[in-house]
Amino acid sequence: MSLTYTEIQAITEDYFKLDGRQVTDIYFNTSFFMKHFMDQKKGLFERPSGGERIRVPLEFDEGQGGFYARGGTISSDDNDVVNCAYFLWKNAYGNATIYDEDEIKNAGDYAIVSLITQKVANAQKTVTKKIANQIYNQDADSSVNITGLKACCFAGTSTQYGGITPTDLVASDGSYPWRGINTTTTEGISLKVIRELASTAKLYDGPKGKPNVGLTTETLFNTISGILQTQQRFTQDTDTAKAGFTNLVFENKLIAADDYCPSGYLFLLNSNFIGWAIHRDGYFARTPWADLVTANVFGRTMKIKWHGNLIVSNRRAHAAHSNLS
């Protein structure tokens, strides 16, 4: 006899309760960016409850100020210091479906429980991969996909990012603080390349003014690691290693390989100005099991849904290099 929806739902709930952390680790254990910024929340992490867009305040200029003498003129003008970027909601899902034939073939308590948990775990892996695959893309604001790191660092000055066209945001010195910062020179990865790229994204001296996270491919990471091991000039971040990600710390930058990083790329990010906004009701939320509405097929289905986007509050705090070997 087929299980009732109450029974299927109970099995699903038990799966998430009984396995505890192992279940939620599925969302984060294949991508360093997902682990570091979404699970460990080592960056911006907002949980809006709604709105048409995700509002992210940003600072791009200085207010009025200076030295003065008694009787001198003091300005009270208000510079337009704070503006806001607006990122659109992006929606991802993973599907779990059980056909009636599956239930017949998996009769018995153990078999049906295993079937349901396997299907749900696969839905978790699916939604995770969909998100992780888009972290590094260059899709426009209006795309259904996440507004990725390439969009942050490589989109042109006439292309909107976070709802702002870079040439529309001008600092008092005439520069464009909302432009993407990148290098496309074809060259080999080296410590010199890392230092020079980090300098292009330097906001100011101090612990929060420079990139502190580096993301690259396993191939490039191994090259960097080999250079540093020879010179014995690096340490390792223990928390990241415990999470299962090989890493090294070089000149206050945590550098790690991410399987989803595109070939030939290195991204240097400042975690104080980048992270995630995830809807309060959309952090891998589960829908109840329901009838599968498909012609000539009987079954039940549920979804794991995610609503959010990658957000940036200071675009020039990050830089990327392509064409590396």
Predicted segments with their positions:
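Flexible, glycine/threonine- and acidic-rich loop/arm segments that mediate assembly and lattice contacts
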Residues: M1-S325
